């Protein structure tokens, strides 16, 4: 079971872990967007058998280039992952399996080490900004703002709202106002060409497809100001109502 902690908010890990335990299925946490997020006082990335983090530059903890990290509580997974990342080696010139060149280079490690000490502060700033956005947008007709879940810390890697109609028109008009907006993500996984062999077609997963048609990401970064958020929201409210 892969639990994707999308945009920095945890999935419902209590229910997921119950199902996994009942059927003896390992849980993999996709924590790529959830550096420092918590679920019931536990850090995201500490709940599954394996957890994956991304250090892509746009992430909450981003490298200078690219990178990522796997963490696990399972020693067998640990040993195999270490081999796979380094050409399948267990020692110098000793290759047990066919692996990859997936080592985090030292330059990226230095950048990440320097930025790590600021992560909690940046996460708090993102959380504060997300709450401010939510407070302004919570009652605006024509859109749905994120909901803050109890017993969780949302790090707002992305601040995404749902535009209930004419999203593409909203995007163009927001850009005319100088507001950069993006779609995360426009194509549901089951409709990606890479998975066409699975046999899915449009209409098979209507909720996923609806989300992809409505989702819109607003500007979000640790140092965004209240004035900037207010401007974004003022523009969005006028456009959505129009």
Mark where each language-model region is:
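Active-site phosphate-binding strand-loop segment of PLP-dependent enzymes
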Residues: 1-63, 69-71, 217, 221
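PLP-dependent aminotransferase class I/II
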Residues: 1-4, 9, 13-15, 22, ...
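Short glycine-enriched loop/turn motifs at secondary-structure junctions
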Residues: 61-65, 152-155
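A conserved catalytic-core signature of glycosyltransferases
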Residues: 65-66, 107
């Amino acid at each position: 079971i892969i639990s994707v902690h999308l945009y920095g908010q945890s999935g419902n890990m209590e229910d997921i872990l119950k199902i996994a335990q009942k059927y003896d299925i390992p849980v993999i946490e996709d924590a790529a967007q959830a550096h420092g997020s918590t679920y019931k006082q536990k850090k995201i990335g500490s709940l599954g058998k394996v957890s994956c983090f991304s250090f892509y530059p746009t992430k909450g903890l981003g490298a200078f280039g690219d990178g990522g990290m796997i963490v696990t509580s399972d020693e067998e997974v640990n040993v195999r992952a270490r081999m796979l990342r380094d050409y399948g080696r267990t020692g110098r010139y000793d290759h047990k399996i066919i692996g990859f060149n997936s080592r985090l280079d030292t330059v990226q490690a230095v950048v990440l080490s320097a930025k790590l000490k600021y992560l909690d502060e940046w996460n708090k700033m993102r959380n504060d900004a997300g709450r401010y956005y939510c407070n302004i947008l919570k009652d605006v007709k024509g859109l749905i703002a994120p909901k803050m879940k109890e017993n969780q810390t949302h790090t707002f890697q992305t601040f995404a709202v749902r535009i209930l109609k004419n999203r593409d028109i909203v995007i163009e008009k927001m850009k005319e106002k100088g507001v950069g907006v993006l779609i995360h993500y426009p194509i549901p996984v089951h409709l990606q060409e890479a998975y066409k062999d699975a046999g899915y077609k449009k209409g098979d997963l209507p909720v996923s497809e609806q989300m992809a048609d409505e989702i819109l990401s607003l500007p979000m970064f640790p140092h965004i100001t209240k004035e900037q958020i207010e401007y974004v929201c003022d523009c969005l409210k006028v456009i959505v109502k129009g």
